[in-house]
């Protein structure tokens, strides 16, 4: 297994971005932790004039994303980037989106066997001691690469909705909105860079 299997909750996040940007031309988008490439591929098909870049630390995931990009004939720039590196590519975007690892180790025992058997741990788990690890780092990067008024979108762990909102507000993001998924769980966040 090289990437997560796309889920309905991720489709809801994608729909939110499309509804916000469908009438805007030339939207510059960065997807962090692209995995299979499902987020940028759908955005590339629906937001026609968009310029999309996708990063992932895993070469296996990028191979899957490359194949999916070719199958779907979408123009996406894929790059192997570790979000925790201090020297990141110089990029400025209108939208930063991520469905990063967010399952804590203590939640592992309650997971379905097929997820553990078929999806990479690298894309799933965060330490119990720092469940917001990726959200914090991606938001830090967002402060540098999002244009003023740019939008940050996250898929989140339902157990940490309020904490993720507080994190973003504490970092200066504005109009932070927490949304529930189709199952009634806190699952998505949108926030603006001032």
Label every model-predicted segment.
Residues 1, 79-81, 127, 179-181:
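Conserved beta-strand termini and adjacent loop/short-helix elements that scaffold enzyme active sites
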Residues 6, 100-101, 120, 148:
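Proline-centered helix-kink/hinge sites
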């Amino acid at each position: 297994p090289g990437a997560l299997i796309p889920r309905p909750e991720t489709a809801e996040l994608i729909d939110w971005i499309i509804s916000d940007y469908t009438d805007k031309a030339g939207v510059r988008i960065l997807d962090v932790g692209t995995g299979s490439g499902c987020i940028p591929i759908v955005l590339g098909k629906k937001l026609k004039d968009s310029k999309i870049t996708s990063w992932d630390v895993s070469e296996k995931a990028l191979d899957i994303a490359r194949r999916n990009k070719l199958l779907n004939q979408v123009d996406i720039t894929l790059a192997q980037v570790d979000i925790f590196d201090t020297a990141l590519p110089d990029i400025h975007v209108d939208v930063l989106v991520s469905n990063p690892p967010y399952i804590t180790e203590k939640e592992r025992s309650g997971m379905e066997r097929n997820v553990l058997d078929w999806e990479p741990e690298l894309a799933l788990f965060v330490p119990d001691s720092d469940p917001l690890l990726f959200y914090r780092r991606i938001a830090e990067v967002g402060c540098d690469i999002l244009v003023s008024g740019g939008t940050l979108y996250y898929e989140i762990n339902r157990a940490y909705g309020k904490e993720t909102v507080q994190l973003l507000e504490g970092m200066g993001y504005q109009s932070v909105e927490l949304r529930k998924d189709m199952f009634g769980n806190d699952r998505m966040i949108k926030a603006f860079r001032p």
